C-alpha cells in the first residue's frame, strides 16, 4: 500500500496506522535535531494556516505559531471574540470560507463533531488542537518524550494514566498506546473510566499491534513497574468549579504523590502532565480550591513535591508539542 501523508487531516489518530504514527514521530525527531543544530530547512514557505481557538491555550497556540514560523508559514489566530464563528456563522460555512483562503486549519474547542465538520467541508487539511474527546497532537508529544527518556523499545515501554480517565487525555493515551503496541494502563474510579465503546475499539487495535491494555480501579495493579506516570487536571476546561466536591472525593486516592511514585517499584520512573497543572495554590484556581479544600493546598492532581522533583519531565513534554506539531504540518502541507 502506498505511503503518503500529504493533505492528511489529524483528527484523533483513530484512522492513522501504526506506521504513519511512527513516521510522524521520526519526522518530529529529525525536525527537533535540525532546530537544535541550526540546520532547519523551511518547507512551508508561502503556506497560510488558520488557527481557530474556541478554548484558551498557551502551549497549543504557541507550538503551532512557532512551528509554522520556523517552517516559513504564516498564521492567523481566530477566536470567538474576533470572528463570527458560532455567533452569526456556522462551522460548516466557516470551513467553506477558510478553506478557500488557507492551506490548513487548526481547531481547538469542544465537540469532536465540530473538528470533523471542519474536515468534511474545508477542502484543506484540518488539525485537531484539542476537543473534549481527543488530543492527538499532545499524544505525539507524549510518545516522543517517552522515547527520549526510556532506552527500551517502544513496544516494551509501559505507562499509566491515573485520575479522571473520561477526558481527552485518558481517551487519547489509551488510543495511542493501543495503536503503537505499548503497555498502557488506565487507572481511575469506576465512574471516571473511559467509555466501554472506546475501550472495545482500542482492544481491537491492541490485537493488531500487540499492545497490552489494562483498565482498572486498582492503583497498585496499574502502577506496578511502569516507566511513566501520567495525570491531568481533575476538572477540565469548561466544567464549573461546583463539580470539584464530588470529583475530589472520588479522585483523592489517585493523586500523584511521592508515595504513589514509589509504589511503581521503578527508581527511574518519570512523571508526565500535559499542563497546566495544579501542583500548588499559587494560581487563582489553585487558591480557590485550597480555600475550600485545605488538604489540597500542596497540589491537586499532583503534589508540589513530585512536580518540582527530577521525576517531572512535563516541560520537555511541553517543548515537544512544537516539534511534533511541526512534523504534522510538514508531513501534510509541504
Curated annotation (Swiss-Prot):
InterPro entries xref list = Asp/Orn_carbamoyltranf_P-bd, Asp/Orn_carbamoylTrfase, Asp/Orn_carbamoylTrfase_sf, Asp_carbamoyltransf_Asp/Orn-bd, Orn/put_carbamltrans, OTCase_ArgI
What GO biological process terms are annotated to this protein in UniProt?
A: arginine biosynthetic process via ornithine; arginine catabolic process to ornithine; citrulline biosynthetic process
A single Gene Ontology CC term = cytoplasm
Q: Name one Pfam family in it.
A: OTCace_N
This enzyme catalyses:
carbamoyl phosphate + L-ornithine = L-citrulline + phosphate + H(+)
- State where the protein is found: Cytoplasm
Disulfide-linked positions: none
Known role: Reversibly catalyzes the transfer of the carbamoyl group from carbamoyl phosphate (CP) to the N(epsilon) atom of ornithine (ORN) to produce L-citrulline.
Give the protein's recorded name. Ornithine carbamoyltransferase
According to its UniProt entry, this protein's organism is: Haemophilus influenzae (strain PittGG)
